[in-house]
Amino acid sequence: MAITQERKTQLINEFKTHESDTGSPEVQIAILTDQINNLNEHLRTHKKDHHSRRGLLKMVGKRRNLLTYLRNKDVTRYRELINKLGLRR
């Protein structure tokens, strides 16, 4: 299921770096993580939905690229985000 506008606004408010921030890597990664988690739940019940699985793999790749960018740019922001989102256990 797609992410709702309220949930997206909530994620933006939680991860923004300044007042009018909507496109920082932190916000983009948080939104992608929420979408990935929702799609993961969908695929647990609909195992043969290969079209959605491809979309999931594209989202995971995009998130990986954004995480690599953030790690190269600022390691402390990267580590804070990883801990906040619960990634890389």
Curated annotation (Swiss-Prot):
<dbReference type="GO" id="GO:0006412">
    <property type="term" value="P:translation"/>
</dbReference>
<dbReference type="GO" id="GO:0003735">
    <property type="term" value="F:structural constituent of ribosome"/>
</dbReference>
<comment type="function">
    <text>One of the primary rRNA binding proteins, it binds directly to 16S rRNA where it helps nucleate assembly of the platform of the 30S subunit by binding and bridging several RNA helices of the 16S rRNA.</text>
</comment>
<comment type="function">
    <text>Forms an intersubunit bridge (bridge B4) with the 23S rRNA of the 50S subunit in the ribosome.</text>
</comment>
<dbReference type="InterPro" id="IPR000589">
    <property type="entry name" value="Ribosomal_uS15"/>
</dbReference>
<protein>
    <recommendedName>
        <fullName>Small ribosomal subunit protein uS15</fullName>
    </recommendedName>
</protein>
<dbReference type="GO" id="GO:0022627">
    <property type="term" value="C:cytosolic small ribosomal subunit"/>
</dbReference>
<keyword id="KW-0699">rRNA-binding</keyword>
<keyword id="KW-0687">Ribonucleoprotein</keyword>
<comment type="subunit">
    <text>Part of the 30S ribosomal subunit. Forms a bridge to the 50S subunit in the 70S ribosome, contacting the 23S rRNA.</text>
</comment>
<keyword id="KW-0689">Ribosomal protein</keyword>
<dbReference type="GO" id="GO:0019843">
    <property type="term" value="F:rRNA binding"/>
</dbReference>
<dbReference type="InterPro" id="IPR009068">
    <property type="entry name" value="uS15_NS1_RNA-bd_sf"/>
</dbReference>
<comment type="similarity">
    <text>Belongs to the universal ribosomal protein uS15 family.</text>
</comment>
<keyword id="KW-0694">RNA-binding</keyword>
<dbReference type="InterPro" id="IPR005290">
    <property type="entry name" value="Ribosomal_uS15_bac-type"/>
</dbReference>
<dbReference type="Pfam" id="PF00312">
    <property type="entry name" value="Ribosomal_S15"/>
</dbReference>
